[in-house]
């Protein structure tokens, strides 16, 4: 099940936000060792606090969240314009009301085994495509690890790479995902098939390499 969260829902749906921010701390700080700000077991940054992000989450019937991502309009403050800017030699000029940035792509500790984790990742991307299509967003921009290229291909929504990071940063790319009805249909069909099949990808690849 997919849900949309916005910052004004923090007090009325505190459980969902608590699970999401705790999961981000567990994955990004504890597992991956990223230098992120964690307070009271919540991983939040200035975009969560000062901007107006939209969050997309996957949820079990029990209410437990299994995955999440964050969306920000590129006409405002984004990580690509600031934190990620020094990763790339060439300037990445993405500033459009129809292009939104996706960051904090996270498979939560409750995502499950390998098959279930890949299903969560696919459900998040399928939901992202549908949400974007319904709201007039034409492109999604994000930073991803090279290890995710094969995963995106298998899921059925591959980005167009815009730039590659400097070697000392790692093997990161800025990519642009086209939002089209065909892509959304492909994602929905692949998700349906995936629910009946075993995943060829370990959950760790999906957690470690998704959109940052």
Swiss-Prot record:
The gene is raiI. It catalyses: a fatty acyl-[ACP] + S-adenosyl-L-methionine = an N-acyl-L-homoserine lactone + S-methyl-5'-thioadenosine + holo-[ACP] + H(+). This is Acyl-homoserine-lactone synthase. Required for the synthesis of autoinducer molecules which bind to RaiR and that are involved in the restriction of nodule number. InterPro entries: Acyl_CoA_acyltransferase (IPR016181), Autoind_synth_CS (IPR018311), Autoind_synthase (IPR001690). GO terms for molecular function: N-acyl homoserine lactone synthase activity. Belongs to the autoinducer synthase family. Its EC number is 2.3.1.184.
């Amino acid at each position: 099940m997919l849900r949309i969260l916005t910052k004004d829902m923090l007090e009325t749906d505190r459980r969902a936000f608590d699970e999401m921010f705790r999961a981000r701390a567990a994955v990004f700080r504890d597992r991956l060792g990223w230098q992120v700000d964690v307070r009271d077991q919540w991983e939040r940054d200035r975009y969560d606090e000062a901007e107006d992000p939209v969050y997309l989450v996957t949820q079990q019937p029990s209410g437990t969240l299994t995955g999440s991502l964050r969306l920000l309009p590129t006409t405002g403050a984004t990580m690509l314009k600031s934190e990620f800017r020094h990763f790339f030699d060439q300037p990445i000029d993405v500033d459009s009301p129809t292009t939104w940035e996706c960051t904090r792509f996270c498979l939560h500790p409750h995502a499950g085994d390998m098959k279930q984790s890949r299903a969560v990742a696919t459900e998040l991307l399928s939901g992202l495509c549908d949400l974007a299509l319904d709201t007039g967003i034409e492109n999604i921009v994000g930073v991803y690890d090279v290890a995710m290229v094969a995963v995106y291909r298998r899921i059925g929504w591959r980005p167009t790479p815009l730039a590659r990071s400097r070697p000392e940063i790692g093997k990161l790319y800025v990519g642009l995902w086209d939002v089209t009805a065909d892509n959304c249909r492909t994602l929905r069909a692949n998700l349906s098939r995936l629910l009946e099949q075993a995943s060829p990808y370990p959950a760790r690849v999906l957690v470690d390499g998704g959109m940052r």
